[in-house]
Regions:
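Basic- and aromatic-enriched surface patches that contact anionic nucleotides/nucleic acids
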Residues: 2-178
Length: 178
């Protein structure tokens, strides 16, 4: 199942978190590591999903569930919550934890590293890209900014490839056991 599909299922309430699951406990280092692994196309584990009847499902959060069945995320919650927060720019409906763990992630186009926003390091540096902004609006706006800076021209094709690689993380297939 593609990452984008999982996030869409959460948005419409067809995938939820069972009430017995713990809250979100990941820290920024774990989130950064996840994004680095996905960027490098390394495996990040599978999802364990329990399909059950909506009327008997006890879930976290206040999101409405669809009639019929719902997919409950039994394993993979920390990864999916992190990805949801980075890609959507907000926590999912079932969120219980510290949203700072996935807020403000940036990527450096030369060094190919993910780091969380630091104004002294990143402000006014066009090589630091806001990952959430990139995921939400695509690479076009970032490319437009880079094209206007003549000294970046020699590396522009590499930068475009890296931007597209990050944006394509949404299309990565995660193995899901149902």
């Amino acid at each position: 199942m593609k990452i984008a599909t999982v996030l869409d299922l959460i948005d419409i309430g067809s995938m939820a978190l069972p009430e017995f699951q713990r809250g979100y406990v990941w820290n920024r280092e774990q989130v950064r590591g996840l994004m680095h692994s996905l960027y490098k196309k390394h495996p990040v584990g599978s999802l364990l999903i329990w399909v059950t009847k909506t009327e008997t499902a006890e879930t976290r959060g206040d999101g409405a569930l669809p009639p019929g069945t719902v997919k409950l995320l039994l394993d993979g919650q920390q990864r999916i919550t992190s990805l949801y927060g980075i890609i959507r720019g907000r926590p999912p409906k079932f969120f219980d934890g510290n949203a700072e763990a996935f807020t403000g992630l940036h990527f450096h186009l030369d060094d190919e590293v993910f780091e969380f926003y630091s104004p002294t390091k990143m402000k006014d540096n066009p090589l630091w890209i806001n990952v959430t902004e990139l995921m939400q609006i695509g690479s076009g706006k970032a490319i437009e900014r880079l094209v206007k800076i003549p000294e970046l021209a020699p590396n522009l094709s590499d930068y475009i490839n890296r931007l597209n690689a990050i944006d394509s993380i949404k299309q990565i297939e995660l193995h899901g056991e149902e």
